[in-house]
């Protein structure tokens, strides 16, 4: 098989003064540039919602940030960072004030961003241009191209990179031991050898559509998500073909194909204790348990169905210990469950977005939610209560993917009470933005809190999420 490879970053960037909008994306006349160096900070939550009314109590979290103003994210180069900007952000945080700020913006005139993966100093981005680009310190470090179409998912395991594509293929790439900026294609999942061996036996074919059969080890539709098991030995792939497939990375074998849902599987998350969570366009969130934990084989059984609703489940996230699970839906709501022993109990609903939740990322006590309304909400969990710390604004299109890493500067200093995270957000506006986010809550005085606006609870869904206003109706395609 011929190797596809990429070298160092090229210099064919297009100098631009505006970020192109995604197709059919209306212009937002409320975006206003008012800051020097085209940099901007997160919108203060105090300006958006009543901080005293918490989502855990079933009250509206905040007014939609749809009409909030923010400085334009327009850049004058393909890779931008503001000199001195980072030092100012550090100083603000060191002074004890919560300041979630934009560090930089990565823009390339080639495609909408559908997938992200952060690994140490490197950031991998996938788009509908078929390119996978690698960034280091806000600069393009490498690039490689696949012939498999839109890159819907990326995950990194040691020196291997796995990419899931719209055409149902999973590509495997290796980093060259001699040159870290060179990536070579190492194969596909399933391997050609396994495809040939399986095709001989008629019992290996299953019906995927009316009058259409395919090998059970192959996905018959787009690969929507990839996730690694806790021990790194298994790879889970979710697909629009309604299945989840389980791969053993040591020999690239497909161990199991789970008929998981009645519609497209949009997300899969592997967590601790052999638990696997899946969310689907059929409106359900399911918990699967790996029966043969610690063995070379893998069999999974359905342990629990957490949610069943009319709206599509469009995103999932869980902490490493699987103690809390988050689910985002096409109605703009985020449900969450807490684990007690072997059972999950519904913890509440987070209401911070006007349109569909397209991505979620959990980091420590924080949850980041990205939406089709172009914003990212930063939530902090304290016990059963979630508070919105800030709303990150600046994208000019739906926020499609998120990735989070510990801020290196925060890690060196030991973190302390002000642990900070680097958040990457990819959008259909063809840009990736890099944010510094603090775990510290905003310091809102009593006088400021008294002046915060109040909202009519009847205009938003009930605490059980059963009634939706026109602003929160199903706002996105069920498949993501």
Language-model-derived ranges and their functions:
Residues 1-58, 62-63, 68, 183-211, ...:
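Terminal intrinsically disordered, low-complexity extensions flanking WD-repeat/beta-propeller proteins
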Residues 85-109, 136-139, 203-215, 301:
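A short helix->beta-strand "capping" segment at the edge of beta-propeller domains
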Residues 103-108, 141-146, 185-191, 214-218, ...:
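Short C-terminal beta-strands that terminate individual repeats in beta-propeller domains
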Residues 110-116, 149-155, 196-199, 212-228, ...:
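Canonical WD40 repeat/beta-propeller blade segments in eukaryotic WD-repeat proteins
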Residues 121-124, 142, 159-162, 232-236, ...:
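Structural hallmark of WD40 beta-propellers
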Residues 126-129, 164-167, 222, 231, ...:
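Conserved strand-to-loop turn within each blade of WD40 beta-propeller repeats
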Residues 132-136, 170-174, 238, 244-248, ...:
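WD40-repeat beta-propellers
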Residues 174-181, 289-297, 338-342, 380-384, ...:
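Short loop/turn segments immediately following beta-strands, especially the blade-tip
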């Amino acid at each position: 098989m011929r190797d596809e490879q990429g070298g160092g970053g090229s210099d064919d960037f297009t100098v631009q003064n505006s970020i192109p909008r995604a197709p059919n994306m209306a212009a937002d006349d409320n975006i206003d540039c008012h800051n020097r160096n085209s940099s901007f900070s997160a919108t203060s939550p105090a300006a958006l919602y009543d901080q005293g009314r918490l989502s855990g109590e079933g009250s509206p979290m905040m007014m939609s940030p749809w009409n909030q103003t923010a400085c334009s994210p327009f850049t004058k180069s393909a890779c931008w960072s503001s000199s001195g900007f980072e030092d100012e952000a550090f100083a603000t945080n060191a002074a004890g004030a919560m300041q979630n700020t934009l560090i930089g913006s990565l823009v390339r005139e080639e495609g909408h961003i559908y997938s992200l993966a952060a690994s140490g100093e490197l950031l991998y981005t996938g788009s509908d241009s078929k390119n996978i680009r690698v960034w280091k310190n806000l600069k393009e470090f490498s690039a490689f191209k696949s012939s498999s179409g839109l890159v819907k998912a990326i995950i990194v395991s040691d020196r291997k990179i796995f990419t899931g594509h719209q055409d149902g293929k999973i590509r495997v790439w290796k980093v060259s031991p001699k040159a870290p900026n060179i990536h070579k294609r190492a194969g596909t999942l399933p391997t050609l050898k396994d495809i040939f061996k399986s095709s001989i036996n008629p019992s290996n074919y299953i019906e995927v559509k009316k009058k259409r059969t395919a090998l059970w080890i192959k996905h018959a539709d787009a690969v929507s998500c990839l996730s690694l098991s806790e021990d790194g030995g298994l790879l889970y792939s979710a697909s629009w073909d309604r299945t989840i497939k389980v791969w053993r990375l040591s020999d690239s074998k497909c161990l199991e194909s789970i008929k998981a849902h009645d519609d497209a599987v949009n997300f899969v998350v592997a967590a601790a204790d052999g638990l696997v969570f899946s969310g689907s366009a059929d409106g359900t969130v399911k918990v699967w348990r790996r029966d043969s934990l610690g063995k070379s084989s893998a069999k999974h059984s359905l342990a629990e169905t957490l949610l069943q609703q009319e709206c599509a489940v469009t995103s999932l996230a869980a902490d490493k210990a699987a103690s809390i699970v988050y689910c985002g839906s096409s109605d703009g709501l985020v449900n969450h469950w807490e684990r007690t022993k072997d059972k999950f109990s519904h913890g509440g609903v987070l209401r911070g977005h006007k349109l569909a939740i397209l991505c979620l990322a959990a980091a420590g006590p924080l949850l980041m939610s990205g939406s089709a309304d172009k914003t990212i909400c930063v939530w902090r969990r304290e016990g059963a209560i979630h508070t919105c710390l800030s709303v990150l604004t600046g994208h000019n299109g739906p926020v499609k993917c998120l990735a989070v890493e510990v801020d290196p500067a925060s890690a060196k200093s030991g973190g302390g009470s002000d642990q900070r995270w680097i958040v990457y957000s990819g959008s259909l506006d063809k840009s990736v933005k890099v944010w510094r986010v603090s775990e510290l809550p905003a310091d809102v005085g009593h006088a400021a809190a008294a002046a915060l606006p109040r909202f009519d609870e009847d205009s938003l869904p009930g605490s059980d999420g059963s009634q939706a206003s026109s602003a929160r109706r199903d706002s996105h395609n069920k498949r993501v």
